[in-house]
């Protein structure tokens, strides 16, 4: 019998609170690059182990550190003066049952492939130095994956999720995803991948402040830069009408000095990421598992990216909590909003958490007894089928940042 708790949440519905703040760090932000590398390396190790053994050995690659390089962007060109240093750390298994694995090579290759796919104007071989210092784990750590039934939790920890997204949350995420989409880059090559979107809702007005690294070789002069910046404002303003009827005001690169006639007054980069010139990055300092940073919502400080998808509850429970919340809100009538918190105990099966706590805001006229059994059933089903989370992560079907 699982300890599933359903309680009514005595809290104002997200759309009715006076102030809401939402942030998303885009795929080219140094923290997001770190998240992406950590997760991609984990996926590559999973594939390596699966191909050889049919199962996944212990690993965690959630300790990626980016130390920024140096660059000299100029209108119409520029160059990298010092490459970006990327350090891969964590733990993995390089030998098991007489089989040796090329752990470091696979990790470095995965990191470089991610950079190639993600930062279009980055020359990975010339402009980055990728170093692997992933430690080699002991056989004792591997044993946990060989037990019968659900894997045992590797830690006493918790995961948090909620649903549905608010209008502001949806708009913030959609804005970054549009600006960093492949079709958009093809039409607007001057727009780099290092994009941060900060959303503020004050009552019925939403303000979006966007920091966007411009790629210097595609911007010939000050006038072209300003034209691209102003076009971005118009594009995002048009996008906003698809997600909200509220007033939306858009700002882009507010630190620019339009009185400057040279590059010094503008957000120019050679590669499209600030990691080239002074902005460091680490796993877990950016987006949560749902892709957002949401101080007005319950959040876990746990970094999901790079953690092993077999029994690391810091990853599994954060993803699972969001899936449960979405499922309940979409399929149980009468629930306006839901929070989910799942707590593990180290050594206990991950499908038997110490507590699976849910909190619901109900529609007017709906009572808790009208929905609690349905909520319990959905939570129980997800815990019973928790391996789906692992399978989706291993196959790269689930985003963790």
UniProtKB/Swiss-Prot annotation:
Lineage, top-rank taxon, reads Archaea
Which GO terms are recorded in the biological process aspect for this UniProt protein? Answer: one-carbon metabolic process; S-adenosylmethionine biosynthetic process
**Top-level class of the enzyme under EC nomenclature:** transferase
> Catalytic activity annotated for this protein?
L-methionine + ATP + H2O = S-adenosyl-L-methionine + phosphate + diphosphate
- One Pfam family cited in the UniProt record for this chain: AdoMet_Synthase
Asked if the keyword Ion transport belongs to this entry, the reply reads: no
Record keywords: ATP-binding, Magnesium, Nucleotide-binding, One-carbon metabolism, Transferase
- Which residues bind ATP per the record? 135-140
Q: Which cofactor does it need?
A: Mg(2+)
Which pathway does it operate in?
A: Amino-acid biosynthesis; S-adenosyl-L-methionine biosynthesis; S-adenosyl-L-methionine from L-methionine: step 1/1
Give a yes or no for keyword Transferase in this entry. yes
Q: What is its EC number?
A: 2.5.1.6
**GO MF assignments:** ATP binding; magnesium ion binding; methionine adenosyltransferase activity
Which InterPro entries does this UniProt record tie to the protein?
A: AdoMet_synthase_2_family (IPR027790), AdoMet_synthase_3 (IPR042544), S-AdoMet_synthetase_arc (IPR002795)
Q: What does this protein do?
A: Catalyzes the formation of S-adenosylmethionine from methionine and ATP.
Q: Which family does it belong to?
A: Belongs to the AdoMet synthase 2 family.
Q: What NCBIfam families does the annotation carry?
A: PRK04439.1-3, PRK04439.1-5
Name of the protein in its database record: S-adenosylmethionine synthase
Q: State the gene name recorded for this protein.
A: mat
């Amino acid at each position: 019998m699982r300890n599933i708790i359903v309680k009514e949440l005595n809290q104002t519905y997200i759309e009715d609170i006076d102030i809401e703040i939402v942030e998303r760090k885009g795929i080219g932000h140094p923290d997001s690059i770190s998240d992406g590398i950590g997760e991609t390396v984990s996926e590559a190790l999973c594939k390596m182990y699966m191909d050889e053994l049919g199962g996944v050995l212990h690993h965690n690659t959630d300790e990626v550190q980016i130390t920024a390089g140096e660059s000299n962007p100029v209108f119409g060109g520029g160059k990298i003066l010092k490459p970006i240093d990327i350090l891969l750390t964590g733990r993995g298994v390089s030998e098991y049952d007489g089989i040796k694995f090329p752990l470091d090579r696979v990790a470095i290759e995965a990191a470089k492939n991610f950079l190639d796919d993600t930062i279009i104007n980055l020359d990975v071989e010339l402009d980055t130095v990728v170093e692997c210092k992933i430690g080699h784990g002991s056989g004792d750590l591997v044993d946990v994956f060989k037990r019968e039934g659900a894997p045992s939790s590797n830690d006493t920890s918790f995961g948090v999720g909620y649903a549905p997204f608010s209008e502001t949350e949806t708009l913030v995420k959609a804005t970054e995803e549009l600006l960093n989409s492949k079709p958009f880059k093809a039409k607007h090559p001057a727009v780099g991948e290092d994009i941060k979107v900060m959303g503020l809702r004050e009552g019925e007005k939403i303000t979006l402040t966007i920091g966007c690294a411009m790629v210097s070789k595609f911007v010939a002069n000050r006038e072209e830069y300003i034209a691209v910046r102003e076009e971005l404002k118009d594009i995002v303003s048009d996008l906003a009408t698809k997600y909200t009827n509220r007033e939306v005001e858009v700002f882009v690169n507010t630190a620019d000095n339009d009185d400057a006639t040279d590059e010094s007054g503008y957000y120019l980069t050679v590669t499209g990421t600030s990691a080239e010139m002074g902005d460091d990055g680490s796993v877990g300092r950016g987006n949560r598992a749902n892709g957002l940073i949401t101080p007005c919502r319950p959040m876990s400080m746990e970094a999901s990216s790079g953690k092993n998808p077999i029994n690391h509850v810091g990853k599994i429970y954060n993803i699972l909590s969001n899936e449960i919340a979405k499922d309940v809100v979409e399929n149980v009538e009468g629930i306006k909003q839901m929070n989910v918190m799942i707590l593990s105990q180290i050594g206990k099966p991950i499908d038997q958490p110490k507590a699976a706590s849910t909190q619901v805001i109900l529609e007017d006229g709906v009572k808790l007894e009208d929905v609690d059994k349905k909520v319990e059933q959905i939570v129980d089903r997800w815990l019973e089928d928790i391996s789906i989370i692992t399978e989706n992560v291993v196959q790269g079907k689930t985003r963790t940042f």
